[in-house]
Amino acid sequence: MKLHEHQAKEIFAKYGIPVPEGKVAFSLKEAKEVAEELGEFPLVVKAQIHCGGRGKAGGVKIVKDMDELEKAVESLLGKVLKTFQCPDGKPVNRVLIEKATNIDKEYYLAITLDRSKSKPVIMASAAGGMEIEEIVKENPEAIIIETIDPELGLMPYQARELAFKLNLPVKEFASIALKLYQIYSDLDASLVEINPLVLTKEGNLIALDAKLDIDDNALFRHKDLEEMEDETQLPQLEVEAKKYGLNYIKLNGNIGCMVNGAGLAMATMDIIKLAGGEPANFLDVGGGANVEQIANAFRILMADPDVKAVFINIFGGILRVDRLAQGLIEASKMVELRVPIVARLEGTNVEEGKRMLQESGLNFIIAEDMWDGAKKAVEIANKQS
């Protein structure tokens, strides 16, 4: 789950990480009130969306007076902001108004999980700001990476070593780095990022931007954070799927996937790619896969206009395949299936399950195995496109 910049900065401030003075506004009236409260110009107006690249897309504006502030806010609120990271755009429903910072140099600082090591890492660079992606592509060595022992946490000597390498005030930088790790640990974050961390001309370090992503699997421990989620930033199909209790993530392909089990769902997407296709989603219906759950999954898949074919990949372990087939038949009668359905079934009573689907009179195409199913789904999707 992603938080907005202003939400992340509020958390940073509680932990003692310096952030610019500012406040969020949901309307022009509120923006003017915030400007008056801050009491001086120049101010910075920042669109709040769950996407990077705002600066290059005109989502961050420096204003010198109230007239410029009004124009900036009106140009952002209620609009869709498209960035290179989000070409389809995200709606801007709030803006952050902050005091401008006297920047001397920009840096990068983040903590995330290195899945190859199964350990968190802290990453820092003397090259921060809007160009960080390009800099890392051209010169990966520009990023300094330190592995963190999860049993010990980020050690003070590691934070000091980073400060020395970046030629930054040691005490101040180490304090920020250690507090950033505390946030990462306390909130079960998957990513905490400051880009840029700026050194001001007065010699202070300030988190000019803030990014905080929370592990969805840990949200049961953080109900206060879960309530902060802005669903307007999510694909509406994901919001709908969440109501049904489905694990669904929208992707950019044209082959809808319905699978039981997260591991099999990942393998299904891989084999679709291997067959030359593009998955339209990740969708794990869970181990139960009852009629209602399957019907809801069909509703989500059929609501996606990009979907040209559906690949159902089910392994019946505890769940008998004949019962699952009956569930598929009943669910398909509840939802209009506008595209062909390729089904690969395996497990207990699989032959009976296949026979039931073939005799149902519905638009099911039976696959012999995963590879056969993936090839059939790709072929159908290409014909439908």
From Swiss-Prot:
Self-association and partners: Heterotetramer of two alpha and two beta subunits.
ATP-grasp domain boundaries: 9-240
Binding positions (ATP): K46, G53, R54, G55, E98, T101, E106
Family assignment from sequence similarity: Belongs to the succinate/malate CoA ligase beta subunit family.
Cofactors required: Mg(2+)
Organism, as annotated: Aquifex aeolicus (strain VF5)
Binding site for substrate: N260, G317, I318, L319
Positions of Mg(2+) binding: N195, D209
Single GO biological process annotation from the record: succinyl-CoA metabolic process
Cofactor: binding comment: Binds 1 Mg(2+) ion per subunit.
Pfam families associated with the record: ATP-grasp_2, Ligase_CoA
Reaction it catalyzes: succinate + ATP + CoA = succinyl-CoA + ADP + phosphate; GTP + succinate + CoA = succinyl-CoA + GDP + phosphate
Keyword annotations of the record: ATP-binding, Ligase, Magnesium, Metal-binding, Nucleotide-binding, Tricarboxylic acid cycle
Pathway: Carbohydrate metabolism; tricarboxylic acid cycle; succinate from succinyl-CoA (ligase route): step 1/1
Root EC class: ligase
Domain of life: Bacteria
One cellular-component annotation, GO: succinate-CoA ligase complex
InterPro entries per the UniProt record, alphabetical: ATP-grasp, ATP-grasp_succ-CoA_synth-type, ATP_grasp_subdomain_1, Succ-CoA_synthase_bsu_CS, SUCC_ACL_C, Succ_CoA_ligase-like_bsu, Succinyl-CoA_synth-like
The protein, known as: Succinate--CoA ligase [ADP-forming] subunit beta
GO molecular function, one term: ATP binding
EC number(s) recorded for this UniProt protein: 6.2.1.5
Function field: Succinyl-CoA synthetase functions in the citric acid cycle (TCA), coupling the hydrolysis of succinyl-CoA to the synthesis of either ATP or GTP and thus represents the only step of substrate-level phosphorylation in the TCA. The beta subunit provides nucleotide specificity of the enzyme and binds the substrate succinate, while the binding sites for coenzyme A and phosphate are found in the alpha subunit.
